[in-house]
Amino acid sequence: MSGGSRIQLLSPRLANQIAAGEVVERPASVAKELLENSLDSGARRIDIEVEQGGVKLLKVRDDGSGISADDLPLALARHATSKIRELEDLEGVLSLGFRGEALASISSVARLTLTSRTASASEAWQVETEGRDMTPRVQPAAHPVGTSVEVRDLFFNTPARRKFLKAEKTEFDHLQEVIRRLALARFDVGFHLRHNGKSILSLHEAHDEIARARRVGAICGPGFMEQALPIDVERNGLRLWGWVGLPTFSRSQADLQYFFVNGRAVRDKLVAHAVRQAYRDVLFNGRHPTFVLFLELEPNGVDVNVHPTKHEVRFREGRSVHDFLYGTLHRALADVRPEDQLAAPAAVPELVRPTGQQAGEFGPQGEMRLASPVLEQPRAPQQSFSNGGSGAGYQYQYTPRPSQPLPAAEAQAVYREFYKPLETGAAPATALPESQGDIPPLGYALAQLKGIYILAENAVGLVLVDMHAAHERIMYERLKVAMASEGLSGQPLLVPETLALSQREADCAEEHAQWFQRLGFELQRLGPETLAIRQIPALLKQAEANRLVQDVLADLMEYGTSDRIQAHLNELLGTMACHGAVRANRRLAIPEMNALLRDMENTERSGQCNHGRPTWTQMGLDDLDKLFLRGR
């Protein structure tokens, strides 16, 4: 700043244009602000008309409560709002808008016309303003009860801003995404969109489970609903409900992720971290989960006044929210079994309402307890094939998950039976029961293909199983259970490693000393900015302890929790499971294949191997008929 410059007040027009830089980024930003105002007014139907991606025209019309003639000029003034009056109102605000900046910012960079009528008024009133003229003009108009806002020629008076706009299709795609998010947030409101005179979207009000599921399917695609798991869990004043996509319906981009807090669409790093943790064990590298989730909590438990766009929020009890989200999603994904994936997609599947440990109640990090109840399967007669023949070590029966976890050594010993050479004399094949109700979800084995795949028949048709991937997941889950039950043993270091940290990091390490100790670490503070690592988990003796502790402390300060140590341990267990699992070209007898299928049905996350690859797939009779043109 030059020495001769004097401090002076900015003109209202310039101040609004500066504010518009934060609030109005593109036509989608305008649509968001106008639609939120319509929803706050109690509208039950909103019509959106767009031309040229929203740059030439963006018109939003609703049937809400309307604005009185006396309030129309104030509606375009900065920091004028009907949503809050006192600071206490801000702490518990439930409306989508409350800052009183949107219309003033929009009118400073576009030609804006607002027409409104209340139920008690005999006629409607209209106010107009343009970017170069901030003085509003009020006049009578014809309009039903409700409000229409027409925004023309966006950024007409700021050519530099207009140059940064993308192609018409790109801008319209962003605008559509805003409408989709709000349509998911408010099932009780109808949304109707037209672009360049063509109807693009028509969503009617959805007041029941079937209608809500249809709306989600219309927005996210029918494939999502076919591969989605409904959840509804409530605990300690927090409720999470919605739909989470199965790992088999992952995406290459994070473009099908919708998260709402008290009806407000948000993008929050704490939420993203919790979801990423929950899916970490089942997603293939580089893939992203899909979900439509709604978190409900007391309004004073979340601060929405963090950013002008209100996309970011701050939770008062961030650690509790994180653990609740992670635990709920982790448990829901773990409880998915083959029969859940085989079930025909209903209009509204039964909601999953787990309780206790199934509701996401976990012990301290590193001591996660897997649920012990078993999926009840119809029991077939227990025919034993463990007669020293090719099926030695296995029994052909339903094998529920053990109520007491197996020790790691025993779990591995059992599966070493896979490596025993096959003896001559084939075991008897199993015929399918006459009643389809007696057929287990993955059916009964028919044959083995190229020593890699198991072919089985179930009530739906043909099941193909990657035996190595499936066996790998079974061993991995049993090793995790064994480790959780036996605890983590520590390995003292002959020469303790010193670690230079900031004072804040050292304080964090001291605060979480017991947490580290449960995971096999022993940390000692030597000074204000120095730690000594005296012991590490025995399984991690090859790991870089310094870097791992630093990364964990960074997570603890950012999210209040960390799963890095557990992730390292799981990686080692996964390697053990991979090397211990049955290899390709290993010939299995029919009883061995059936035993593997039964174990898959009773193993958590059996649909994916440790690396996120699918372990099995289903081909129905309809799919097979299409291959051979049957029925045409």
From Swiss-Prot:
Superkingdom of the source species: Bacteria
GO biological process: mismatch repair
Matches recorded under Pfam families: DNA_mis_repair, HATPase_c_3, MutL_C
Keyword DNA damage: yes
Keywords: DNA damage, DNA repair
InterPro entries: DNA_mismatch_repair_CS, DNA_mismatch_repair_MutL, DNA_mismatch_S5_2-like, HATPase_C_sf, MutL/Mlh/PMS, MutL/Mlh/Pms-like, MutL_C, MutL_C_dimsub
PROSITE patterns: DNA_MISMATCH_REPAIR_1
Example of a GO cellular component annotation carried by this entry: mismatch repair complex
One GO molecular-function entry: ATP-dependent DNA damage sensor activity
Family, similarity comment: Belongs to the DNA mismatch repair MutL/HexB family.
Job of this protein: This protein is involved in the repair of mismatches in DNA. It is required for dam-dependent methyl-directed DNA mismatch repair. May act as a 'molecular matchmaker', a protein that promotes the formation of a stable complex between two or more DNA-binding proteins in an ATP-dependent manner without itself being part of a final effector complex.
HAMAP family associated with the record: DNA_mis_repair
UniProt-recorded name of the protein: DNA mismatch repair protein MutL
